[in-house]
């Protein structure tokens, strides 16, 4: 229904952003809302209009490729919008695609809500069908350019990041395990989320 929404970021929360377009605020659920910052600069968010009997929502993405992977994930039995967002929030799209192509169930089950059965279904449904999802279209989440000076981070950003992890479906015990590592750094909310997800997907669970 909507290809994209262009406007200004009015609100950023753990699960969604609000984009103001001509005086109308669009609530858009995104994989990691904190990649969007409130500013007077106009942005474009590529959207997916999700409609079911009990829900109608807009999901938003920074690129068409990210949205494409989201729609492909929704086509897998056992994966709903929240699960698909949690997978995309990791920012490790290339690894997700590689895991599917190499039938790496151990990697896939690290995502919240993905058990062995769902991981197998992802492989069965998507293997060989992700050539149009280009990993290079996604921002490198851990590039040196994104590192913040230590003086710029604060506990407020970390608190927001932890809240976002819980919203993605990670259990409190999982969140608690990555906190010591996160406390060693001083990052933006977005970077804390990406760092935490990297730790969770690489064994800190």
Curated annotation (Swiss-Prot):
Cross-referenced SUPFAM superfamilies: DNA helicase RuvA subunit, C-terminal domain, Nucleic acid-binding proteins, RuvA domain 2-like
Disulphide-bridged cysteine pairs? none
Subcellular location, record wording: Cytoplasm
Residue span of region Domain II: 63-141
Residues annotated as region Domain III?
Answer: 153-205
* Keywords, sorted A to Z: Cytoplasm, DNA damage, DNA recombination, DNA repair, DNA-binding
Q: Which GO terms describe its biological process?
A: DNA recombination; DNA repair
Taxonomic superkingdom: Bacteria
- Region Domain I, annotated ranges: 1-62
Q: What's one GO-annotated cellular component? A: cytoplasm
Recorded hits in Gene3D superfamilies, A to Z, give: 5' to 3' exonuclease, C-terminal subdomain, DNA helicase RuvA subunit, C-terminal domain, Nucleic acid-binding proteins
What's this protein's family per the entry? Answer: Belongs to the RuvA family.
Entry text on domains: Has three domains with a flexible linker between the domains II and III and assumes an 'L' shape. Domain III is highly mobile and contacts RuvB.
Q: What is said about its interaction partners and assembly?
A: Homotetramer. Forms an RuvA(8)-RuvB(12)-Holliday junction (HJ) complex. HJ DNA is sandwiched between 2 RuvA tetramers; dsDNA enters through RuvA and exits via RuvB. An RuvB hexamer assembles on each DNA strand where it exits the tetramer. Each RuvB hexamer is contacted by two RuvA subunits (via domain III) on 2 adjacent RuvB subunits; this complex drives branch migration. In the full resolvosome a probable DNA-RuvA(4)-RuvB(12)-RuvC(2) complex forms which resolves the HJ.
Job description of the protein: The RuvA-RuvB-RuvC complex processes Holliday junction (HJ) DNA during genetic recombination and DNA repair, while the RuvA-RuvB complex plays an important role in the rescue of blocked DNA replication forks via replication fork reversal (RFR). RuvA specifically binds to HJ cruciform DNA, conferring on it an open structure. The RuvB hexamer acts as an ATP-dependent pump, pulling dsDNA into and through the RuvAB complex. HJ branch migration allows RuvC to scan DNA until it finds its consensus sequence, where it cleaves and resolves the cruciform DNA.
Please give the name of this protein: Holliday junction branch migration complex subunit RuvA
Protein source organism: Bacillus anthracis
Quote the gene name from the UniProt entry.
Answer: ruvA
